[in-house]
Amino acid sequence: MSETIISAEVVEKNNAARKPDLERDYASLGERLDRRGIAIDAIRAKVEKFAVAIPSWGVGTGGTRFARFPGAGEPRDIFDKIEDCAVISQLTQATPTVSLHIPWDKADPNRLKQAASRFGLGFDAMNSNTFSDARDQKLSYKFGSLSHADAGTRRQAVEHNLECIEIGKTLGSKALTVWIGDGSNFPGQVNFARAFERYLDAMKAVYAGLPADWKLFTEHKMYEPAFYSTVVQDWGTNYLIAKELGDRAFCLVDLGHHAPNVNIEMIVSRLIQFKKLGGFHFNDSKYGDDDLDAGSIDPYRLFLVFNELVDAELSGAEGFDPAHMLDQSHNVTDPIESLMLSAVEVQRAYAQALLVDRKALEGFQDGNDALMATQTLKAAYRTDVEPILAMARLKTGGAIDPVATYRAAGYRAKVAAERPAVTGGSGGIV
């Protein structure tokens, strides 16, 4: 039996106070869904199986280019991060895996595995870092990494990615995510074609080191840290990379890495259709790559993304098995609370998408009834699925209200007393 950090008594007490209302709400929603030909228990069962990974760096306090304001009880190392992730998993029952970032989370792999298994956690995709310089690094990535003009720097970046794979093999991970900051700030600074060719050559060396049962995820981003051009700037370039590398290379979609107002759900559909959707980094944004909490700004867009995912799931799309992870920066909130709510919002979008009357939708589409087609989607989106999500948590041992239970447990105050306070502000995302 896995250990838990929040006491069972606290969880049970909070659940007991909320259970009668939840049961009434669940029964009421069940009756309404039954009139639509939907079995609420079947939807709940699917929600219970849905999972999203927590990024190790997400449990720390985030920042911006201008400042970072330390939070109380920040994790001191990866082992503190694992404990924070265990709290999220315990209360939401939706986040059973942690995604590590190397070298930020570098430690003895066997010790890491033991620490995670203590709380019933596993490890999701490994994340390499060639967008900043490590303390003991020989060559700098200031002017690029996998696309750098210097062969030695490219080789160093390749070796780092291969090291991430080796660490991941011990941990039981099955994927490597590669995001680079390579690009330029001025016209003429780099030759677009040569830089991309160097990147492809380097990534082929990384792909060659991939175990047979692993996947390689490449992540595109329109801008930042480079502001004139980025080597892997959009889904078109990302798709070319995945096609060039091989069958185990896929495109990873971060919801904040696109130009404003881009139709992300259509990009998702295209990548599914051509069997190159690897997975997601869920977050939300208003202006750019804001890394805000998932569903906090545009929950309808999140629903529309999941509408495409559920459509692929139900139609049995070939090779469809996307990875799900949160990727956020928490500057003014408790990271644990934000990550719990974000995991729930991702589940919410999934549950709502499961309610879409797909037979009716297809009929309206084929009949060119634009109004009723969009109303069919809106009918699912407007349905309050909170009772389904809460009941799923209750049935699997989680908290009906994760944030209220977390606050009642006093976890943040406890770790703030144990972990030395970080003093002084700084700039930087993490």
From Swiss-Prot:
Keywords: Isomerase, Manganese, Metal-binding. It is an enzyme of class 5 (isomerase). Mn(2+) binds at residues 257, 289, 291. The keyword Isomerase applies. It comes from the Bacteria. Pfam families: AP_endonuc_2. Its EC number is 5.3.1.-. NCBIfam families: L_rham_iso_rhiz. Belongs to the rhamnose isomerase family. This is Probable sugar isomerase mlr5709. The lineage of its organism: Bacteria, Pseudomonadati, Pseudomonadota, Alphaproteobacteria, Hyphomicrobiales.
